[in-house]
């Protein structure tokens, strides 16, 4: 197994490092279950994985990666929804400012971005988050629908096409 050659990895990588330069480790395909504990991951301040590299992500893959999470870890699927997260934050920053009671997140089963989005919203809002599966194959916006349920109104963020996201606010 490639991750069991710990002494070899460190011996090869260490001489290439510049002193006082932050190190980022990137696994573009298969990553170790606990990137921060791997030989290269121990040397890095940031660790970037790509759990969706082969398009066959399972819930078990996400649970394994989540169990090994350490501050400084990130995934390309999380980075892929950066603009979407900005739209979501902007949508919530509009009147009326009511507390969110629950959230609905939808996206394709085989893409981890909707799961990352649901986890982020659960962590930030501390409200129930319901994840539904769609048959959409829109690669540019893997989170195809989002609804913030509030007492008197809802906020919806929907993908219209590869260039358009519709935000419906009261």
Segments the model singles out, each with a brief description of its role:
Residues 2-3:
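Short, small-residue-biased leader/transition segments that mark boundaries at the very start
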Residues 10-85, 89:
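Contiguous mid-protein beta-loop-alpha structural module that forms a pocket-lining wall or clamp
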């Amino acid at each position: 197994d490639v991750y069991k050659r710990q002494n070899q990895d460190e011996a090869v990588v260490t001489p290439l490092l510049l002193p006082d330069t932050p190190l980022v480790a990137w696994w573009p395909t298969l990553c170790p279950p606990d990137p921060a504990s791997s030989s290269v991951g121990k040397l890095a301040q940031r660790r970037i994985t790509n759990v969706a590299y082969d398009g066959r992500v399972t819930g078990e893959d996400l649970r394994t990666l989540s169990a090994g999470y350490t501050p400084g870890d990130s995934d390309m699927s999380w980075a892929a929804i950066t603009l979407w997260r900005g739209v979501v934050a902007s949508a919530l920053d509009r009147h009326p400012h009511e507390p969110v009671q629950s959230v609905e997140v939808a996206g394709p089963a085989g893409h981890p971005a909707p799961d990352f989005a649901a986890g982020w919203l659960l962590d930030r809002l501390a409200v129930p988050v319901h994840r539904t599966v769609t048959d959409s194959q829109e690669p540019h916006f893997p989170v195809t629908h989002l609804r913030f349920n509030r007492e008197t109104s809802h906020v919806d963020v929907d993908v219209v096409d590869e260039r358009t996201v519709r935000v419906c606010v009261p």
